[in-house]
Amino acid sequence: MEKNLTTGSVFKAILTFALPYLLSYFLQTLYGMADLYITGRFCGVDSITAVANGSQVMHMLTVIIVGLAMGSTVIIGHAVGAGNMRDAEAAIGNTVTLFMAVSLGFTAVLVAAVRPLVGLIGVPAEAVPGTVQYLTICFIGIPFITAYNIIGSIFRGLGDSKSPMYFIAVACAANIALDILFIGPMALGPVGAALGTTLSQTLSVIVALFGIRRHKTGLRLSRQNFRPRKGVLGRILKIGLPVAVQDGCIQVAFIIITIIANHRGLIDSAAVGIVEKIISAMFIVPSSMLATVSALSSQNLGAGKPERAAQTLKYAAMIATGYGIAVVLVIELVAEPLLGCFTTDATVVLMGCQYIRGYIVDTIFAGIHFSFTGYFAACGKSYIGFLHNIIAIVLVRVPGSYLASRLFAGTLLPMGLAAPAGSLLSVIICVAAYRWMKRRGTLYTAA
């Protein structure tokens, strides 16, 4: 399953790696949206709000885990690019050990804190019971959710984006089937949505483990690889921690924005929750470019080919920008019927259309700074991604959303525009940092 990405056409390598990841991301987004869509078909606005708020919290947890795993992807990629499979095996073994410990810790803390957490995010009173039920079930399943995401990160470090696609396809199909069963005939509401998500990812992990045993990976993992090694864990955390904190802060910003929407009432809360799900689907290419640039650049830097790594960044940013412009034009035309797929409430559709027409512009700028973030991580400088995101959140995204909510009580459009404004600032910082370090010759350092 290991694949070398350091030779041949850079553009072709991007497409070869990115297309399976694109499909994987689409499938993962699809099963995430299935919870909200099926809940909207069978339940009321209170259940929609519960699932929207609960899934927002779970998405935050997931991106923190995936962000931390970026360290594993990069370290494995460096080892594969350099042809050192022993280092790759050590990185994989220590990744498994680290993340199983992290997942058990998350489970213990979050199950105990679920009610205070729901109170903290300001869920409307009507949706509190459903949100608590949803999160309790999902928190119990954190070890399986972690394993599900870590398996994909390891394979991408090996240059294999196809195998995770198959595992995600299993989870997607299972989640949709279970959601229909649990939320429809069994009328379990948010509980059914949580069960569908957790059980489907558990099934995917089981399938992945069987798949790994049946295919030749070129790796020989031993018990020694799973013993914690300070040097290996240090390299993983050096890259992964800034990305995890960065992604966590981004999700905190989203939750703060959700809290702002919650305080505007049930209708606006439901509208923002639905749009967040749609936006996550629209981010399929920006997110794919982040993963693609980090994996390809890691292998190329490990192989001593920094020029190919820079070309990867260039092509990825161009692809993401073109995609973003196309998505903006399409959403402006189909916003109403798209929102109507998730709810029959005309007022929720109206407010959601206002929000998404401002928010969707973010796909243009996010694609660029996502590409830079992946590149900086591959260069061993993931702290730059952390810094530009924190600055954008603190100076623009959160205060912009708050002020827009206070100044424009009758519309969600200005709130939606806060996101692309923050991403534009991130792009400016990324370009400036890249040019400055390139002139100084300090871009490429060992991870």
Model-derived regions, located:
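Helix-terminus/linker motif at the lipid-water interface of multi-pass membrane proteins
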Residues: 30-49, 118-125, 181-188, 248-281, ...
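Short alpha-helical transmembrane segments in multi-pass integral membrane proteins
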Residues: 1-18, 76-143, 185-241, 297-362, ...
